[in-house]
């Protein structure tokens, strides 16, 4: 009845039963959620961002995901709700002074404390390792524990002083119920943003059409008194009266080229009190004037000789 060696097998060793459900190690799950990027599965390194559902990402991984235009994106379901870089918020994290990182166990002869976290709450001092609920503000990106938010009730951020609303508080790595609530808020927020854009478009079109109307009639409108026909006739008569005056002034100013306006400026050298030797240098002197008999007919002369 027994096998070799006197062993007796039992029924469950011979007959295959239903498979047992494998239980996920909670500690390993918490380490994966709080220390690794949800998109690239790499260790979180600054700058660290969070989406509207409370998941942690490396900013470089999110940018690469958005730039990737291929049809098949690796782990696309984890970030399918991220359409642009505006859908994530860069987190302002407070370092844990007790965390040594990789320097504490360089030789491999020490126990790694997985519960030791890199970041802590700046208000209460709790470590951000998954044992305590943490949240961040979408308006400023500051991260602190949920206990600090409940104990110190205020409408202002505890670290930077920025004002926030209840809708801005997002739980990091929350439960399935928390994710459902955050997803409903996200969809409502995006729908509201679309409606605001639609309402802004007709206003922008009106603002563009208003300058066209103003170009036709710029400046304030002036009320004209009296009949328009009379005013137009008066203006024509004034123009006709001014026309001859302007022509006369133009003729007086144009005149002969080179003639001075005042007669006092033109004077003869003969009237001056200079010596006769000086006066003989000019053509107006009596010695320069010759009669037709004295001048030869074949000699070229100018008008100054007469």
Curated annotation (Swiss-Prot):
Alphabetical GO biological process terms: cellular response to hydroxyurea; mitotic DNA replication termination; regulation of DNA stability
Record PTM Phosphoserine, positions in chain: 287
Pfam families documented for this protein: Rtf2
Chain ranges passing through the membrane: none
Subcellular localization(s) per the UniProt record: Chromosome
Positions of the UniProt region annotated as Disordered: 193-276
Main location per the UniProt record: nucleus
Any GO CC annotation of this UniProt entry: replication fork
Keywords tagged on the record: Chromosome, Phosphoprotein
KW Phosphoprotein (keyword) present: yes
InterPro entries hit by this protein: Rtf2, Rtf2_RING-finger
GO molecular function: DNA binding
Post-translational modifications reported in the UniProt record: Undergoes proteasomal degradation, via DDI1 and DDI2. Removal from stalled replisomes and degradation are required for genome stability.
Segments of skewed composition (Basic and acidic residues): 226-240
Domain of life: Eukaryota
Function: Replication termination factor which is a component of the elongating replisome. Required for ATR pathway signaling upon DNA damage and has a positive activity during DNA replication. Might function to facilitate fork pausing at replication fork barriers like the rDNA. May be globally required to stimulate ATR signaling after the fork stalls or encounters a lesion. Interacts with nascent DNA.
Subunit: Interacts with DDI2; probably also interacts with DDI1.
Family: Belongs to the rtf2 family.
Protein name: Replication termination factor 2
The species this protein was found in: Macaca fascicularis (Crab-eating macaque)
């Amino acid at each position: 009845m027994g096998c070799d060696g006197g062993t007796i097998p039992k029924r469950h060793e011979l007959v295959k039963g239903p498979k047992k459900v494998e239980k996920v190690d909670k500690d390993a799950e918490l380490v994966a959620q709080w220390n690794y990027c949800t998109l690239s599965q790499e260790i979180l390194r600054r700058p660290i961002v969070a989406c509207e559902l409370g998941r942690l990402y490396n900013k470089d991984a999110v940018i690469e995901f958005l730039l990737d235009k291929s049809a098949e994106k690796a782990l696309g379901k984890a970030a399918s709700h991220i359409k642009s870089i505006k859908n994530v918020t860069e987190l302002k994290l407070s370092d844990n002074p007790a965390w040594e990182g990789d320097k504490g166990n360089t030789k491999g002869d020490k126990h790694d404390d997985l519960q030791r976290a890199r970041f802590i709450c700046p208000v209460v001092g709790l470590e951000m390792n998954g044992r305590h609920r943490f949240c961040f503000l979408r308006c400023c990106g500051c991260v602190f524990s949920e206990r600090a938010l409940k104990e110190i009730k205020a409408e202002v951020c505890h670290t930077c002083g920025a004002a926030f609303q209840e809708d801005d508080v997002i739980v990091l790595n929350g439960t399935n119920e928390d994710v459902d609530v955050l997803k409903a808020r996200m969809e409502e927020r995006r729908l509201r943003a679309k409606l605001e854009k639609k309402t802004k478009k007709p206003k922008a079109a009106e603002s563009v059409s208003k300058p066209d109307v103003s170009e036709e009639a710029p400046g304030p409108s002036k009320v004209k008194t009296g009949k328009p026909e009379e005013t137009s006739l008066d203006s024509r008569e004034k123009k006709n009266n001014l026309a001859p005056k302007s022509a006369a002034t133009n003729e007086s100013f144009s005149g002969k080229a080179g003639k001075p306006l005042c007669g006092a400026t033109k004077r003869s050298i003969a009237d001056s009190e200079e010596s006769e030797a000086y006066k003989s240098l000019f053509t107006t002197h009596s010695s320069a004037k010759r009669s037709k008999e004295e001048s030869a007919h074949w000699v070229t002369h100018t008008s100054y000789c007469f």
